[in-house]
Amino acid sequence: ETLNLRVKGDNGLEAVKGLDMIIHEGEVLGIAGVEGNGQTEMIEALAGLRKVEKGSFRIGETNLTNSTPKERREKGLSHIPEDRHKRAAIDEFTVEENMILGVEDDYAKGAILDFAKISAKTNEYIKKYDIRTADSKVKFGGLSGGNQQKVVVARELEKENRFIIASQPTRGVDIGAIEMIHNTILQEKTKKKAILVVSAELSEVMSLSDKIAVMYEGKIVGVLKREEATTEKLGILMAGGKIDE
């Protein structure tokens, strides 16, 4: 839940202007909108990567407004970022090494990493998520875009979480990977997770979401139930227009 969330962009101007948003357990809220209307800044603020100027963000009863990304992960936040190379993975690391980024504590015995467990879990996820790689020791940068994204999705969805942020989850991936990622997100919904999907692809937002909110100039200008939403209605809201209720 966010309440009156206000966030500045890199230019110092307000990019998110008083955002109120509630996502329930077992619900997917999709955010539609032309890119550059505050979506990136909103996601970065929720993930702890950008300062919240005003307002609040909480998961359940836990206020996470001023917490670190690590604290948010520990409280049940998973984040599939829009730029996997900048925010989610390191090309020079192996698939195994990327699979434990941010969740190293889950694979440690005291101060020592349990490499056998890391290898076993990574190979389990490679099979489960159909990650096409010779083995878990291959460098992440050597994988195709779709398989890179599957590594990030596997890591973020397999850890303990309550709230999942999926930002442009299928950008730059092939059709087969898109279907697999969509199915995985919908499976998480059945586990009573609260899920936020942000995508520039209207078809993606419409196929995954229970409700669709449209962002325009840093504000949510309309929320439609999936059965009410049409590309025409969403397009009008995305352009700053109004629709008849």
What residue spans do the PLM features occupy?
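Glycine-rich phosphate-binding loops of nucleotide-dependent enzymes
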Residues: 1-245
